From Swiss-Prot:
Chain positions recorded as phosphoenolpyruvate binding sites: K22, N23
Species: Xanthomonas campestris pv. campestris (strain ATCC 33913 / DSM 3586 / NCPPB 528 / LMG 568 / P 25)
Keyword Nucleus: no
Name of this chain's protein: UDP-N-acetylglucosamine 1-carboxyvinyltransferase
Gene: murA
GO MF annotation list: UDP-N-acetylglucosamine 1-carboxyvinyltransferase activity
Amino acid sequence: MAKIVVTGGQALHGEVHISGAKNAVLPILCATLLADAPVEISNVPHLHDVITTVKLLSELGAEVTIDEGTLAKGRSILVDPRSVTHQIAPYELVKTMRASILVLGPLLARYGTAEVSLPGGCAIGSRPVDQHIKGLQALGADISVENGYIKATSNGRLKGGRYVFDMVSVTGTENVLMAAVLAEGTTVLENAAMEPEVTDLADCLIALGAQIEGAGTPRITVQGVERLGGGHHAVLPDRIETGTFLVAAAMTGGSVTVRRARPDTLDAVLDKLTEAGATITTTADSVTLDMHGKRPRAVNLTTAPYPAFPTDMQAQFMALNCVADGVGVINETIFENRFMHVNELLRLGADIQVEGHTAIVRGAERLSGAPVMATDLRASASLILAGLVADGDTTIDRIYHLDRGYENIEEKLGALGATIRRIA
C-alpha cells in the first residue's frame, strides 16, 4: 500500500494553483441525472471520489466521457443522461463514498423511483440521512429503508412544499434542492445550508434551466420546471485545498500565493491565519500569505456551519497549533469522532489534551518525524502539514484517504519547496 514520506525543515515559497472543489463537483455530477440532454462539467479535479461518482453514473446507464484537458484548461466530464436505464445505486459503489446518496433526489425527481444503498465513506461519526429522507417526503415521496437500501417512489411528479431542516445539512440541502427543481409548484427550504458548494450546485442547475432563488442564504425558494436541458458549468475552486496550502505556508514560516482561488469563500479561515500572525493579501482569484519567517501564534476556534469556521479545516489548524507559540483551544461542533488525528500527532511529539468535543493544544518548539497512519481525509492532510515542520522523516500510511480529496498534493507541495515523495 502506498505511503507518503515527508522530510521536514523547509519553508514553503512560491505559487500553487487550486483545483475544483471536491464538495461541489460530486453533487454537480449527480445533478446531471436531472437533465434530458448532455451536460459538460469543467474544472473537475483528479480525485478518487470523482472516479467513484463516474462509475456510479455509468452503472445507472449514463454515458460519461472524460477529457483530461491541459494544465491551463483543466479536466472536463461530459455526462449524457439520456441513456440511463435503471435507478438502483448498489452497495458496492456507495459503500466507499457517502456522497453517493446524492443520486437519490435526482433519480426520484426524474424517474419517479430510486433505490440507494445506505452510504459508507468517511469514518468520522454519525452523518444522519434522515434530513434527506424527511425533506423528500415533504415533496410527496414515499420512502422506506429496507435491507440496507433507501427505497423512494413518487406518484407522478413530486409536489412542491415547505421543509424546515432539523439541523443544517449540506448534502441534505443539496439532495432536496435537486429533487425540488423538477417538482410541481414552489418549494421553500428553510434552515438550508449556506455553503459555497450549495450555491455552486444551484448555479449549475440554473444554467440547465432551473428556477432557484436564495442559494447561499438559509431560505432557498425553487419554482419547479418540467425539464432541465443540457449545458456547461465550471466547478468553483476548492476552499479547503486553498486553506490547507495556506496553513502549510504559515506553519513553515513561508510565503505562498494560491491562484485560481475564491478568497470570498474563506473569510473565517483567513481571519484565523491573520490571528496566527500571517500577512494576507487577496485579489478576486488569489490569496498571498507571508509569515516573514515567524513562528505562528496559537489560535482558538470553534467549527460551525458556513460562514463560520469549517470543520474540514479543523485538523489542519490543530497541526498549526501543535507548533505555534501559546495554547490553542479547538471546539468541534459538527461531527463526532473528528479528533482521530490526535493520537497520530501525539506520535510526532505534539502536546494535545482532548476533553469531549474540545482539544487543548500546547504549542511545541519542534516535532519529531515518526511513522503515522491517516484515519480520514482531512486527518491525512494534518499529518502531512505536521511532517513539513517535524525533524527528520514522517511516513504516512493509508494515504488512500488523501487521494479522495487532494489532487496531486505531493507534486504541489514539492513545487513550493517541500521534500515529499510517495513510495509503494
